[in-house]
C-alpha cells in the first residue's frame, strides 16, 4: 500500500467513480533547523496536487473538491508574534497561484531552542474548518519538521508524518 493509499483510505466495494472531497493541511517547520530542506518541503507541497490527481486517476476515483491549507511554525516561546502563520483553505486548481505565493513566502528563521512548536501547530491544523459536505470526505494533515522529539514532555513525533481523518 502506498502513502497515498493510506492517506485516502482503501476503496470499498462499489465505490469506483465516487467523488471525494479532500482537505489537506501542510504543517511546516520554518525554523533555522530546516535551512537545508525547506525548499524541498515547499516543492513537495506545491507538487502534491498533481501527484494526488495522478494517483486518483489510476485508482479510478475522482476528487470533487480539493482544498489545501498551510500552517507554518517556528518556536512560540522564542519567536513570539513571528512564531507561526496559517493560510486559508485554497480551492485548487482555481487558487493555485495564491497557494504558490503563500508557500513561496515561507522562509526559515528563528527557533533557537528545542523543542519547537510542532505540537501547537499540529493542534492548530486539527482545528481547521474541514469540509463537511459530500458522500466521501478525507481530512489529511501532513507534518514536516526537523525536530522529532519534545524532550520536555518525552513525546516522539515522526519527522514527516501523514495524519488522516476520514469520514
Regions found by a protein language model. Give the residues of each.
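Divalent cation-coordinating acidic motifs and surrounding scaffolds
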Residues: 1-167
Amino acid at each position: 500500500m502506498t502513502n497515498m493509499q493510506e492517506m485516502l483510505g482503501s476503496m470499498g466495494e462499489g465505490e469506483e467513480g465516487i467523488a471525494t472531497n479532500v482537505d489537506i493541511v501542510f504543517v511546516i517547520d520554518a525554523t533555522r533547523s530546516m535551512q537545508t530542506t525547506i525548499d524541498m518541503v515547499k516543492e513537495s507541497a506545491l507538487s502534491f496536487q498533481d501527484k494526488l490527481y495522478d494517483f486518483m486517476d489510476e485508482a479510478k476515483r475522482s476528487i470533487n473538491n480539493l482544498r489545501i491549507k498551510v500552517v507554518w511554525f517556528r518556536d512560540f516561546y522564542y519567536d513570539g508574534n513571528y512564531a507561526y502563520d496559517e493560510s486559508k483553505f485554497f480551492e485548487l486548481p482555481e487558487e493555485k497561484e495564491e497557494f504558490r505565493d503563500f508557500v513561496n513566502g515561507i522562509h526559515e528563521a528563528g527557533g533557537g531552542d528545542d523543542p519547537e512548536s510542532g505540537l501547537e501547530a499540529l493542534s492548530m491544523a486539527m482545528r481547521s474548518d474541514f469540509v463537511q459536505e459530500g458522500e466521501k470526505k478525507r481530512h489529511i494533515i501532513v507534518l514536516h519538521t526537523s525536530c522529532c522529539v519534545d524532550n520536555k514532555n518525552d513525546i516522539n513525533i515522526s519527522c514527516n508524518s501523514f495524519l488522516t481523518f476520514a469520514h
